[in-house]
């Protein structure tokens, strides 16, 4: 049977230990901070990146160069292995499109998947992908199963700082100023892989109650398998979430990590990404 190799980028919020233990090859994004370049999770950690945001420094994220994908695909596929390359949403970054272009330029057998997600929403797809590969499932069937899995995943983002949305052009300076004065915390979700702002909360507690309501509607009669929380230096907010969700949904399995710079660069210090995987 042909060997299958998994490739992804640095935005899944899965631990380095998990990625290494499962032989997942990571092609990282790049970060620019006040003009200086860094390789995500290599030259700088998520925690260190958030410190720069707290200091209101100019930060940007960049997709990997096409040459990095070409080199990786050629090396990994030279023995005839199949490569399954899964990446953050094409609605959030050009990474998927670059990976796909690279796959068309090499002799290796590469299948590129748009996860239409990020953070633990991408991470849960990778974890499922790992199990499917271990079971010997064909690549074409894996693509179908991941498409089905995405229907059972919901991602919410609670914005930490409106300044980052202003810099990114998602809201006007006037709306941002008013929002900051009123201490509004916008909440967004992914719609076909694109971030859409859907609600404005005034306090942490009101944001938690909104999330609880939306999660209950999403899961319906199903149980929750896992909740992933990626936060930008607000562990006390995470603790509040867990307390409310434990009472409401009897959740036993949480995955918690500091959020990927691709999210925190746009949502600011104090943000969280909340991912729900239902059974």
From Swiss-Prot:
Membrane-traversing stretches: none
UniProt KW keywords: Lipid-binding
Domain DegV: residue ranges: 4-278
Pfam families: DegV
Binding site for hexadecanoate: 61, 93
InterPro entries in the cross-refs: DegV, DegV_C, DegV_domain_contain
GO molecular function, one term: lipid binding
Keyword set includes Ribosomal protein: no
UniProt cross-references to SUPFAM superfamilies, sorted A to Z: DAK1/DegV-like
PANTHER family: DEGV DOMAIN-CONTAINING PROTEIN DR_1986-RELATED, DEGV DOMAIN-CONTAINING PROTEIN SPR1019
Role description: May bind long-chain fatty acids, such as palmitate, and may play a role in lipid transport or fatty acid metabolism.
Full protein name: DegV domain-containing protein SAV1425
């Amino acid at each position: 049977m042909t060997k299958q190799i998994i490739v992804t980028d640095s935005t899944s919020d899965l631990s380095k230990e998990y990625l290494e233990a499962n032989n997942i090859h990571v092609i990282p994004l790049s970060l620019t901070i006040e003009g200086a370049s860094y390789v995500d999770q290599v030259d700088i950690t998520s925690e260190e990146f958030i410190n720069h945001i707290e200091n209101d420094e100019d930060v940007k994220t960049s997709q990997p160069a096409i040459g990095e994908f070409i080199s990786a695909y050629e090396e990994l596929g030279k023995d005839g292995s199949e490569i399954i390359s899964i990446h953050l949403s094409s609605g959030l970054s050009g990474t998927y499109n670059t990976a796909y272009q690279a796959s068309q330029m090499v002799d290796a057998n590469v299948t590129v998947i748009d996860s239409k997600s990020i953070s633990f929403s991408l991470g849960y797809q990778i974890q499922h992908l790992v199990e499917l590969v271990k079971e010997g499932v064909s690549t074409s069937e894996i693509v179908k199963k991941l498409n089905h899995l995405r229907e059972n995943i919901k991602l919410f983002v609670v914005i930490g700082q409106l300044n980052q949305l202003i810099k990114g052009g998602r809201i006007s300076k006037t709306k941002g100023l008013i929002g900051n004065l009123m201490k509004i915390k916008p909440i967004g979700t992914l719609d076909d892989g694109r971030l859409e702002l859907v609600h404005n909360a005034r306090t942490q507690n009101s944001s938690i109650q909104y999330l609880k309501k939306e999660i209950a509607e999403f899961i319906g009669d199903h149980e929750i398998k896992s909740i992933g929380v990626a936060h930008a230096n607000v562990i006390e907010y995470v603790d509040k979430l867990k307390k409310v969700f434990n009472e409401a949904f009897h959740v036993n399995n949480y995955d918690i990590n500091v959020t990927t710079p691709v999210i925190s660069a746009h949502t600011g210090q104090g943000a969280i990404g909340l991912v729900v995987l239902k059974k």
